[in-house]
From Swiss-Prot:
Chain spans, region Disordered: 216-239
UniProt name for this protein: mRNA turnover protein 4 homolog
Gene that this sequence comes from: Mrto4
InterPro entries given in the database record: Mrt4, Ribosomal_uL10, Ribosomal_uL10-like_insert, Ribosomal_uL10-like_insert_sf, Ribosomal_uL10-like_sf, Ribosome_Assembly_uL10
Phylogenetic placement of the source organism: Eukaryota, Metazoa, Chordata, Craniata, Vertebrata
Subcellular localization: Nucleus, Nucleolus; Cytoplasm
Organism annotation: Mus musculus (Mouse)
Length: 239
């Protein structure tokens, strides 16, 4: 009787070795960037969206961006003056908490600040986000939805029914009030009706100068991101 493919054993040693190699490659790549670029910026992300971050990577192909794997980045840069790769990089490591990333570039502080201050993209809010406005729906036909979606809309809490094959809202319905912390159902309804309430934004927080080794906080009047969490993001980095 032939063996099932599901019975195939996976060597944990090989898996661990591959993971170690990936981390080592990332460390080497980060240090190479430290040696190559004039400036290193730490950025945080509000309302993280992978697709939006990819757009920024494409716009900044002349530079390098790394996001996630905070602990590995800290090892690459150094956690203290005694093991830092270059002067003052341990100060960078201290700030690698939560959803933050690194931007290596030859663009000046002014160029970086100007570009990222202007760059914002709206997207649909997710559960846990705050509603930025009050949304109410008027009764009547909802011709944008096929009849097959009526049960789904009703399941989300909307007072709907099929009238002559057309999805119809039977009465006024308040989806959310400004300032509400959105539930999964509210977030889904807002997306179905096209309301974008989440602002994706990259906030430049700190800068390190490769030539002088100077580490500085960016202007205090820059908008703040959401509070940093103790955990680290596991998004894929650019390696």
């Amino acid at each position: 009787m032939p063996k099932s493919k599901r019975d195939k054993k996976v060597s944990l040693t090989k898996t661990a070795k591959k993971g170690l190699e990936l981390k080592q490659n990332l460390i080497e790549e980060l240090r190479k960037c430290v040696d190559t670029y004039k400036y290193l910026f730490i950025f945080s992300v509000a309302n993280m969206r992978n697709s939006k971050l990819k757009d920024i990577r494409n716009a900044w192909k002349h530079s390098r961006m790394f996001f996630g794997k905070n602990k590995v980045m800290m090892v690459a840069l150094g956690r203290s003056p005694s093991d830092e790769y270059k002067d003052n990089l341990h100060q960078v490591s201290k700030k690698l908490r939560g959803e933050v990333g690194l931007l290596f570039t030859n663009r000046t502080k002014e160029e970086v600040n100007e570009w990222f201050t202007k760059y914002t993209e709206m997207d649909f809010a997710r559960a846990g986000n705050k509603a930025t406005l009050t949304v109410s729906l008027d009764p009547g036909p909802l011709k944008q939805f096929p009849h097959s979606m009526e049960p789904q809309l009703r399941q989300l809490g909307l007072p709907t029914a099929l009238k002559k094959g057309v999805v119809t809202l039977l009465s006024d319905y308040e989806v959310c009030k400004e300032g509400d912390v959105l539930t999964p159902e509210q977030a889904r309804i807002l997306k179905l009706f096209g309301y974008e309430m989440a602002e994706f934004k990259v906030i430049i927080k700190y800068m390190w100068d490769a030539q002088s080794g100077r580490f500085q906080q960016m202007d205090d009047d820059l908008p703040e991101s959401a509070p940093e969490s103790e955990g680290e993001s596991e998004e894929e980095d650019d390696s």
